[in-house]
Amino acid sequence: MLRPPMTKLVISNRESHRECEQVLQIGECAIVRSSSGEPWQLLNNGNSDSIDYALLQDILYEGYRLSTIYNIKSHTKSMKRLRRKLASIFSNSNFLLPLSKDGSSSSSQPHFYLSPSNSSLFDARKSSRSRGAVIKSPSTINIEKNRHSSNSGENQKMRLNLSMSTGNLCRAGVVRTPYPTSKQLHFDNDDGDEEDDTDDEGEADLVSIKTRSGRRNVLKSPPPPERIPSSMGASDAEEIDIKSHMKPLSVKIPANIFKTPTLDIPVDDDAEIDADVFPLPPPTPVNLKHGLFSIPSGRNSESARSRQTKRSPFGSVTSRTSSLDRRMSLSCLEDTSNYQKTQYLVFPLRTSSKKPYLLKFPEDMQEEDEKHNGSVWGSDTSLEEEIKV
């Protein structure tokens, strides 16, 4: 409903005007709402010259009266409240549907009408209910029984229920499993054996979900990958990997896989291992050039020698990476004497033809005191005076 801007829409009940008005349903999709009895047809998509604001006011009032509060934080409760409201509205308007000869309602009629509570149509509802309660024909009783049976019992289970969270449709009371309910399998938590609800031996051909080993066998994690010792080469590892696919699990790892190539160590449990079999490693020679804190660059002496021979033109690798050598480098301390003197490049302002000269502070200022106007430190306004002149 359109309204001017900066105005408030007030929905009120026009109690005083409803005494002389009639709201009745005639024909298909047509209602009568007028004191003179002239029919007002439902609005179509075409343009209308006049607008019945009183009818729109009643529509707004009735819609506000039938509306429910929706809370976005409690969607489930709001939808339940809406279902109860719609069920009460449609249950009260079922008697308005005209019935045919076979007892079924005509589908061409709308299922809900604008029905103000304080109108003559509301009074007609009460009178029709009172008549139906007093006088009931046999056909009416049969129709009510059919409606009651269709709304309750097994047919109620087959109705579609709307899921409140996901919006999916599901049928209540329908068995979804391919097997009957009496032949379903259940699992025991104590042991992993298969159990069946039925005692018949002829039903043993059903496909079992679990095996005889139980649930633990199904959920058992795979074994960890085999670890290849670091003493073996890449070619030996590839040979073991190829042979492991051709042998069973019991003989997948050979007994001498962890054996040192240069030593012969007995594998039997009862055999004694002599200490002389394991020779001591040779002592690390101390290089006086690198000092007592020198760290060998490798396990073998050959690799250490090869690394020592590879030097860069800027010096050794350790000297460039060590922070101590960087701090104590003499190259950084060569110009330390120059940093103790302050030098100034003086540009003469009065005579621009003279070239700038370099002064070392404070030696040159003390020696040439008379030449620079007798002021060693200068003044705050000396530079400004020279610029003004």
UniProtKB/Swiss-Prot annotation:
Stretches with biased composition (Polar residues): 137-155
Domain of life: Eukaryota
Region feature (Disordered): 119-156, 180-233, 294-321, 362-389
Acidic residues: bias regions: 190-204
Protein name: Uncharacterized protein F37A4.6
Organism: Caenorhabditis elegans
